[in-house]
């Protein structure tokens, strides 16, 4: 399945909404997109996974990489996810401790 993204700026945060599957075939494209944003100085990122059908270990690795890159440049990466299967992946891997996972974009931007 093809991956599609939409990007919008809200209250100082760059929100990247992702649609499709984030896997070994598509994660490199998403990583390139997020890296480009950080290189542009857009280091406060919200990754909205509400439209993601599937996320594999390659996708998880890409998210960790993006988080590190954003924080290295003085920013942060927050995740929006309500899909139980994907949220469970964050819990099983312990990434829920390193990542801020929120139920909505508004909550992620507000930080609560």
List the predicted regions and their residue ranges.
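STAS-typified acidic loop motif
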Residues: 3-32, 51
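Residues at or immediately preceding the N-termini of alpha-helices
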Residues: 27, 105-106
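Amphipathic alpha-helical interaction surfaces in cytosolic regulatory modules
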Residues: 24-98
């Amino acid at each position: 399945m093809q991956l599609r993204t939409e990007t919008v700026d809200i209250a100082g945060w760059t929100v990247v909404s992702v649609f499709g599957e984030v896997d070994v075939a598509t994660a490199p494209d998403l990583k390139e997109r997020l890296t480009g944003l950080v290189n542009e100085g857009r280091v406060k990122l919200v990754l909205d996974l509400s439209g993601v059908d599937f996320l594999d270990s390659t996708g998880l690795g890409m998210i960790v990489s993006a988080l590190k890159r954003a924080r290295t440049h003085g920013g942060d990466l927050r995740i929006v996810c309500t899909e139980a299967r994907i949220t469970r992946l964050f819990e099983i891997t312990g990434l829920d401790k390193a990542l801020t996972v929120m139920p909505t974009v508004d909550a992620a931007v507000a930080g609560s």
